[in-house]
Amino acid sequence: MTWTNKKPRRKRLLAGAAAVAITVAAFAIRTNAAETIDVSDLTKQTHIHGLAVDRQDPSRLLIATHHGLFSAGADGKAERISQVQDFMGFTPHPSDPTKLYASGHPAQGGNLGFIASEDRGRTWTQVSPGANGPVDFHQMTVSPADPQTIYGTHRGLQVSRDAGKTWTIAGPGPEGLIDLAGSAKSRDTLYAATEAGLLVSTDAGRSWKPLVQGAPVSLVEVTPEGTLYAFVLGRGLVKAGEPPVGLETISSGFGDGYLLHLAVDPKNPKRVFAATNGGKLLSSVDQGRTWTALGQPNP
């Protein structure tokens, strides 16, 4: 299994993501609101930077990419619903079904700062440039315990206590950071997936303690109900309650592959979606124990 140790950015840390690097020639994905593209073709043409189940239409999966936000159905067909821009740090509001948050880059270059959508991703506005911004949050999470609290990483770990209007630096952030997830129990508890393992902070990111050591962890996700998911390389997808006391392995057999992004249907937690380092989108109807390619019938 190959792990590329470069800058603390998900697409550069993970060898599988680097293998699907996007060229300038691939920039114009030929789709608009009236056209569709198969997700298997979409993942060959762009990076996936985040997933979320559409809370107002749970049959749809929102896919944040290097070239815009797409909405995909169970048939595996996707359509772009936003303008063309690079969405990073994509995360849904934990309780408001219309709100989404992100960062990244506009098509013409530069940084977007902290941006929000109140129409399920169709239009976006900048809420704040962030601290020392405009920021480009590659990792971002909204606290399920207090949605006014948002964490993002740009030249350190930043925190907002007013839904992204103002930001302060909480600390340098963990070494080799890949992903962040806020706790459902406390706004000051934060989980970090890193090259060295899974970490937890109970003081809003000022200090960290290990939960999993000795293997890279490529994602961490916490549901509003308090179920923690993580992907441990060499082990597989694991889950635990909060606070985590032992991690249950719920699926393995990924070989040299691993999961990069995870989305759980808040209305039906058995429905789970994932993006792999090999550029595949997967779906599960048994809480991640078995998987099929998005667009294919579940067993």
Q: Predicted regions span which residues?
A:
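Extracellular glycan-interacting surfaces
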Residues: 2-299
